[in-house]
């Protein structure tokens, strides 16, 4: 953790502790201060490796951990080529943010293509397939290592729960900001999650 990250974390803890102890009126002001200090407008990407249950039950957890490590090495090596920054790796997921939706889509298509190339030289049970979700909006970011907010939740829902393997799902609001719409072959979908309709674009990698 850098000195700046440590200072930001300390300032956040001071504010959130004040929020806990404050009355309703003060809480509104403190919440606004936290959002002003730590919120950023960004594009969130969540990548999830497909096949956890099947692969671990058949080949064991160490085999699956080796696949996670290969995913981490690949994505780390190319994310800056697409102006992205890794927020964190968690289990078999990658959480990252990008300056705009086109950068996130570009990374998605690149990484899925690289997985396909890697899979040519591996056995089927070692092949890596991933599902990816993308959403844009305001998020709270701390230490450059974690993020919270509805945009983060939406990207996670798209990437972990709704996208199929080798598929990219981009929330419609994020896709509408793309400057390269005509370059992508997409299918518009109306998805449902927890009783909520989620308009999205499906992009095949």
Task: Give the location of each predicted region.
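Catalytic cores and conserved motifs of cyclic dinucleotide signaling enzymes
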Residues: 142-146, 166-168
């Amino acid at each position: 953790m850098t000195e700046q990250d440590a200072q930001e974390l300390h300032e956040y803890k001071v504010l959130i502790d004040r929020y806990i102890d404050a009355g309703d009126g003060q809480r509104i002001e403190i919440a606004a201060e936290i959002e002003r200090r730590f919120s950023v407008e960004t594009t969130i990407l969540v990548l999830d490796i497909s096949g956890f249950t099947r692969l671990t039950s058949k080949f064991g957890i160490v085999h699956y951990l080796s696949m996670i490590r290969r995913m981490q090495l690949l994505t780390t090596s190319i994310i800056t080529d697409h102006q992205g920054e890794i927020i964190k790796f968690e289990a078999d997921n990658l959480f990252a943010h990008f300056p705009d939706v086109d950068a996130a889509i570009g990374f998605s298509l690149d990484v899925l293509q690289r997985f396909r190339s890697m899979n040519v030289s591996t056995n089927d049970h070692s092949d890596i397939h991933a599902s990816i979700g993308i959403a844009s909006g305001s998020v709270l970011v701390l230490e450059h290592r974690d993020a919270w907010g509805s945009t983060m939740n939406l990207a996670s829902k798209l990437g972990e729960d709704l996208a199929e393997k080798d598929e990219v799902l981009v929330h419609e609001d994020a896709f509408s900001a793309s400057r390269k719409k005509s370059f992508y072959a997409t299918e518009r979908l109306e998805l449902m999650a927890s009783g909520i309709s989620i308009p999205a674009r499906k992009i095949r990698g």
